């Protein structure tokens, strides 16, 4: 019986990782379990750093030491025992990929099945004449080769190995024994009687040289014989290399399988690699499968409205100023161009000569020496600089490849059709449309019985995977969407969909706030999807703050009671029904005892607006919108409705550019912003880390460390010893411990085991040398101060205003629990964002700042949201403007103004469907069809 109990539960004994206080917890298996609690209370530590880490460690330890050296190493978490643990998979908020070749389709493997479908039942069409492609006989091939240019020298090749791994000694020996003398190996001609060594782990291509011949009537029979031999050797394929004098040779592919007789072109047999943009077989030869190319941007090289002698040509005056400036002046003098004029004031001939050159020799002086050089034009000069590996990224733009129009594939691959659609059509349609297409069997009724039999299992896999994406609220995305542009919440839901598609059972899934980025409309969809994953026999542990998700859980674990040192305990575990009867913070917000309400501030007397005009980006078409200033404005709408496109991709970069050059207000990409005179800066506060190394911490980021170092340097003992403030920095020589160089830890490489961080035995983790630690303020050394929580430090430095005022802002944003010297890499995204807010609060404010935040409630408990709301409104009370992209109804209902985008995502979005106060948006929801308004109406009842 005892055994059964253990197997039905995961039992954690003595968990002490980070701030966890010797936790004992029993979690039921095969259920939907939610971990909740304040930000920094220890939820993620228990879920990810303890349960998942131990599950992963046990799996890796079961592998051989040889295999382990190639895998990420996972250390043992600080826990006495975990029983009943199953294999664990973590689905966190990290962006899926930074690789420009990753797309939604490749991540979910849907693209792999599409490639297979196109290779097996695709109909080939000629990309030139659009006629269907048919087979080519041996006599047709012979005729085409014989009609090549008279006296051309050609090599007829039989492809033996195509881009495969192996040493292929047997193949090479077989060719030699059958009388072949030469072969092309990886593009280089070799003699087969010589020793050839091929690396078995690398891909190789081997082509037998069947004959080398000159095109003329006398050699017709010889060509025919060679062609027949090559076709037989290579199962109906051959290559012809046409040699050219003083130019690279030309390759032509011929096949008995596929050809367009009208255009006299042969095509290779279709295979999945023909549709892979990561393979030379399928990738566009111009952009190499990226879909985009970097090229010089005239608008970045040249300012047409600035006089030529005042730096209008940025690329010339940006590098080697003297040389290019002298050459440019020589060109203008020779062509009679007045450099006091702007580019737009020159005539067409002068403009063309300036940009593209006119072949004239220009005389000029450089370093007191007379020089004569041809004027190549600004464009060519810029390209020459690029070849010299000078950084011209400031003058380049990423543009859609003109050859493949951004679709990444060769023309021959893009012309293949399935059910009347090309691959590009499937990649550019919203996933919702792709799902409905594959869910309609009539689209494939044209297939014969054999084709149906081949296509059926492939279509089933595609339909399932596309449905799972649609089901988690991602129907607005496209399969061709670049993975780098996907948010953390979207990438997590993609991986949830992929896991459902994998069909795994008996797995422990650990998820980090899957509701992030989801509108209330889609939350129930997500919960149903998670339920489907759980019903397959899996255990779900979800770190979450969303009310609906918590209420739908089978089992809730609340970590607290507070955060940091005041957290790390299980304050509740049990059913939702039991939770609602509890009297701690989470339960109080769920049962309605406590509510998040806006602080009382006087509304601004002056009413100013920021108006964005002519927005055309992604799914937004010709949009103009007014945003009130000196208010808390929420941008709302379902996922994919255009919120980020409008604010982060349009308003933010445009406003930053214009405010940086505030003398002249002009439009960028057609976008015009009216009302910027009411602002002096735009600040974007995201959830990116405040530092990427352990040397970054809240004290250094907020600037309080500078004041603390000055205070220590002002101590009598420090002055006697001549210590300056730099003595108390762990980043420079002098006061720091040199053994660990101010890290406090030393990393020991363990090869087959995880690297171990060992406390420095010289400074014992203090980061400073003993002489520095002898200097004390109120009996505390600099190391003692860095180990204090913000709350403790505020009390300690209460009589030092310059320090106390900065610490007070950290307290105001609810971060009293973090330590001053806490490693920046251990801070959550929500904590990092609030530290940035605290830094802004501590600055002397002009009251003319526009703050932009993207989902600031990510990772925040109801109590934390309350703190955040107070901070946002306090910044507005100072006369600043606050623009927040948000789905959280507690923030939305307490905003001054709402701009709701929609009505749906993707092509069905991109419009402002409702705007006004929260009450106005709620009252007009039936008229505007605003989903936000409908949920807001329920919330405001």
Residue spans of the language-model regions?
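Conserved phosphate-binding elements of NTP-dependent enzyme cores
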Residues: 1-941
């Amino acid at each position: 019986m005892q055994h059964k109990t253990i197997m039905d539960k995961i039992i954690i004994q003595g968990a002490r990782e980070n701030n966890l206080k010797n936790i004992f917890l029993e979690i039921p298996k095969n259920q939907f379990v939610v971990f909740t609690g304040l930000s920094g209370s220890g939820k993620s530590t228990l879920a990810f750093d303890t349960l998942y880490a131990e599950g992963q460690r046990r799996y890796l330890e079961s592998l051989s030491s040889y295999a382990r050296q190639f895998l990420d190493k996972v250390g043992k978490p600080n826990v006495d025992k975990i029983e009943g643990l199953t294999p664990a998979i973590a689905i966190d908020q990290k962006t899926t990929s930074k690789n420009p070749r990753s797309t939604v389709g490749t991540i979910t493997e849907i693209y792999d099945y599409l490639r297979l479908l196109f290779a097996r039942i695709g109909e080939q069409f000629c990309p030139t004449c659009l006629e269907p492609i048919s087979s080519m006989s041996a006599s047709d091939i012979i005729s085409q080769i014989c009609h090549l240019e008279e006296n051309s020298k050609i090599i007829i090749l039989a492809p033996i190995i195509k881009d495969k791994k192996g040493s292929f000694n047997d193949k090479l020996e077989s060719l030699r024994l059958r009388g072949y003398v030469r072969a092309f190996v990886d593009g280089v001609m070799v003699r087969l009687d010589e020793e050839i060594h091929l690396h078995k782990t690398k891909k190789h291509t081997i082509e037998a040289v069947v004959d080398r011949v000159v095109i003329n009537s006398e050699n017709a029979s010889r060509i025919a014989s060679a062609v027949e031999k090559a076709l037989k050797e290579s199962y109906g394929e051959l290559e012809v290399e046409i040699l050219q004098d003083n130019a690279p040779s030309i390759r032509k592919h011929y096949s008995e399988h596929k050809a367009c007789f009208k255009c006299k072109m042969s095509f290779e047999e279709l295979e999945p690699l023909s549709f892979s943009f990561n393979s030379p077989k399928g990738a566009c030869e111009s952009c190499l499968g990226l879909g985009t190319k970097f090229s010089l941007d005239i608008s970045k090289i040249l300012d047409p409205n600035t006089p030529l002698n005042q730096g209008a040509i940025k690329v010339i005056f940006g590098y080697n100023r003297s040389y290019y400036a002298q050459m440019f002046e020589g060109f203008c003098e020779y062509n009679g161009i007045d450099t006091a004029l702007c580019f737009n004031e020159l005539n067409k001939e002068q403009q063309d000569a300036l940009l593209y050159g006119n072949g004239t020799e220009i005389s000029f002086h450089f370093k007191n020496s007379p020089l004569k050089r041809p004027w190549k034009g600004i464009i060519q000069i810029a390209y020459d600089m690029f070849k010299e590996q000078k950084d011209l990224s400031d003058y380049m733009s990423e543009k859609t490849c003109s050859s493949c129009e951004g679709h990444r594939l060769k023309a021959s691959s893009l012309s293949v059709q399935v059910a009347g659609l090309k691959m590009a059509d499937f990649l550019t349609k919203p996933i919702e449309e792709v799902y409905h297409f594959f869910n309609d069997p009539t689209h494939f009724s044209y297939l014969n019985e054999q084709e149906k039999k081949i296509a059926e299992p492939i279509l089933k896999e595609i339909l399932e995977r596309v449905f799972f994406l649609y089901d988690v609220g991602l129907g607005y995305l496209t399969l061709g969407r670049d993975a780098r542009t996907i948010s953390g919440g979207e990438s997590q839901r993609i991986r949830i969909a992929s896991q459902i598609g994998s069909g795994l059972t008996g797995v422990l899934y650990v998820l980090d706030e899957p509701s992030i980025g989801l509108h209330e409309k889609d939350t129930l969809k997500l919960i149903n999807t998670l339920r489907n994953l759980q019903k397959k026999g899996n255990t779900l542990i979800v770190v979450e703050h969303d009310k609906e998700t918590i209420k739908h859980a089978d089992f809730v674990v609340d970590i607290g009671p507070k955060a940091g040192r005041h957290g790390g305990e299980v304050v509740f575990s049990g059913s939702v029904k039991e939770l609602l009867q509890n009297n701690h913070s989470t339960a109080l917000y769920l049962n309605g005892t406590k509510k998040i309400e806006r602080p009382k501030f006087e509304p601004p007397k002056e009413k100013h607006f920021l108006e964005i005009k002519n927005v055309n980006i992604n799914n937004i078409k010709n949009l103009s919108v007014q945003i009130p200033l000196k208010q808390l404005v929420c941008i709302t709408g379902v996922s994919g409705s255009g919120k980020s496109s409008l604010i982060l991709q349009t308003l933010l970069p445009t406003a930053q550019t214009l405010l940086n050059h505030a003398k002249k207000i002009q439009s960028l990409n057609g976008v015009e912003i009216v009302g910027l005179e009411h602002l002096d800066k735009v600040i974007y506060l995201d959830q990116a880390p405040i530092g990427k190394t352990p040397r970054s911490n809240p004290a250094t980021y907020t600037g309080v460390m500078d004041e603390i170092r000055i205070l220590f340097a002002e101590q009598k003992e420090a002055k006697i010893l001549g210590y300056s403030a730099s003595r108390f920095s762990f980043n420079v020589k002098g006061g720091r411990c040199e053994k660990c160089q101010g890290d406090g830890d030393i990393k020991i490489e363990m090869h087959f085991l995880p690297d171990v961080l060992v406390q420095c035995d010289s400074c014992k983790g203090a980061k400073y040398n003993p002489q520095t630690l002898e200097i004390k303020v109120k009996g505390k050394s600099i190391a003692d101060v860095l180990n204090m929580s913000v709350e403790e430090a505020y009390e300690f430095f209460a009589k030092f205003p310059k320090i106390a005022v900065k610490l007070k802002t950290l307290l105001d944003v609810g971060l009293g629990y973090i330590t001053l010297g806490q490693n920046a890499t251990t801070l959550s995204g929500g904590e990092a964002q609030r530290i940035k807010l605290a830094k802004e609060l501590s600055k002397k404010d002009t009251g003319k700042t526009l703050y932009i935040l993207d989902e600031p409630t990510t990772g925040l408990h109801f109590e934390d949201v309350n703190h955040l709301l107070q901070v946002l409104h306090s910044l507005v009370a100072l006369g600043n403007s606050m623009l927040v992209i948000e789905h959280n109804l507690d923030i939305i209902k307490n905003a001054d103004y709402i701009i709701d985008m929609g009505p749906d995502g993707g092509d069905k979005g991109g419009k402002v469907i409702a705007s006004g106060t929260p009450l106005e948006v709620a009252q007009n929801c039936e008229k505007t069809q605003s989903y936000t308004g409908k949920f807001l109406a329920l919330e405001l009842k």
